[in-house]
Each structure stands twice: as C-alpha cells, then as structure tokens.
Amino acid sequence: MQIWVDADACPGVIKEIIYRAAERRQIQTTLVANQMLRTPPSKYIRAIQVAHGFDVADAHIVDQVVAGDLVVTADIPLASLVIERGAHALNPRGEMYTTANIRERLTMRNFMEDLRSAGVQTGGPNAFSQADRQAFANQLDRFLAKIPVA
C-alpha cells in the first residue's frame, strides 16, 4: 500500500499530516506536482515533478496507482479514476470518496461547472478550516488503522 498525493492544490497543513503519518506508519508516500516541492528528508516520502499541463499530475497518479493504494486529492474526476482501479480516494477535507458516492460527487461537480460556463456565479468552497484539518486527520487515521503495520 502506498499513499499518493495530488500535491499541486493540497494544503500545506494536510501535507504535514501526511508526512507524519508516513513516518509513523512507515508507508511509502509520493507527492506528485507540476512544480518543485520540498519534502522532509525521509526514506518514506518522495516528490515527483511532472511536466506542466492540464491533468499531467493526475495522469501520472492514475498510471502508477494500484488497488489498495490511497490517493489524497480534491480532484473529483481523478478520485473517480483511481476508485475504478481499486484504489481509495480521500479529499483534504476528510471525505472518503467511495464507489457509493463518487458518481453523485462527479455529477454535482459537472453541474456546477455547467452553471459557471453559463455565467452563473456559484461561489467556491468555504475557506479551509481547523475542522477540515481535523476531519482529514481522523479519516486518514481510520484508514491507516486498517492497514497492517510494516
């Protein structure tokens, strides 16, 4: 099992939680971004810089992920693709995407995108909060508790 992070838009506080979990549980963790990332020195944590371009980091994650891996992403289409491959997807606000909820999330995302394309002001997500950070940490801990210790 490996953790993959769609790192371009992942909040720094979430990356810090992931770094601590990777060290504590000794889980290989890979951050993928189209920009240079600083990661703590660790044999469990690495960063991969991909070329700039639309969904290049997403494509790399989809190509590399295997069943049972965990992908941290707020990108709903990416979450859908990794779930199809048998991996798990967790967003930075602590919501685990599943086969039961991903289709609804994707439909809502597409609907909102259509509204924005039509000129409707839809607003964005709420500011990232301490409650979001705690929800992510709790969900990550629950997920990792199910994985045998290395």
From Swiss-Prot:
InterPro entries: UPF0178
Superkingdom of source: Bacteria
Pfam families: DUF188
Protein family: Belongs to the UPF0178 family.
Protein name: UPF0178 protein Daro_2879
Organism: Dechloromonas aromatica (strain RCB)
